[in-house]
A protein has these predicted regions:
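Short acidic-glycine-tyrosine-enriched beta hairpin
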Residues: 70-84
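A short, N-terminal "cap"/entry segment at the start of jelly-roll beta-barrel domains
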Residues: 1-31, 115-131
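Conserved short histidine dyad/triad with adjacent acidic residue
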Residues: 19-20, 35-50
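A short hydrophobic beta-strand segment most commonly corresponding to one strand
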Residues: 34-36, 81, 96-111
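Glycine- and acidic-residue-biased ligand/ion/polar-headgroup-sensing regions
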Residues: 53-54, 58-63
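A generic "binding-loop/recognition-motif" signal
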Residues: 51-52, 70, 86-87, 96, ...
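Short beta-strand His + acidic residue motifs that chelate non-heme Fe in jelly-roll/DSBH
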Residues: 47, 65-66, 82, 88-95, ...
Length: 131
């Protein structure tokens, strides 16, 4: 059992996006990862896929997601469930920030382009809380 202060976790800044890894293999989450992300208004994640399921809880904001060439609208208090290897993207269609909590069913998570090329993530080597 471990209690972590989310305020002590490193924030990774990407264009249009703030990322914080709440749980992963480096701090006790052996079989899954939990990410908190804030996507700026009119910004998005890259189109990507991974070899695991992903469940996203929308905490605030609204937007749309693309999943395997289909488009879905969503807003706060909704949950998005992506099967493993589905090509997807989260888009903030509003002006306000979109805040999401993502749980991914593997650790570490390997993120790939839709063509299967690995996307290096700045938090891949995040061991700030030690093992």
């Amino acid at each position: 059992m471990k209690v972590i202060s989310n305020n002590d976790l490193e924030i990774h800044k990407l264009p249009g996006l703030l990322h914080k890894t709440l749980s992963n293999k480096h701090n006790g989450g052996q079989e899954f990862e939990v990410w908190k992300q804030i996507i700026e208004g009119q910004s998005s994640t890259p189109v990507h896929k991974h070899d695991c399921d992903e469940t996203i809880v929308v905490l605030r904001g609204e937007g749309e997601c693309l999943c395997d060439d289909r488009r879905f609208q969503f807003s706060a208090d909704q949950t998005l469930i992506f099967p493993a290897n589905s090509v997807h993207q989260i888009i903030n269609t509003g002006q306000e920030e979109l805040e999401i909590l993502a749980t991914l069913s593997m650790s570490p998570v390997i993120v790939k382009t839709q063509d299967g090329e690995r996307i290096p993530l700045p938090w891949d080597a995040d061991k700030s809380l030690g093992e």
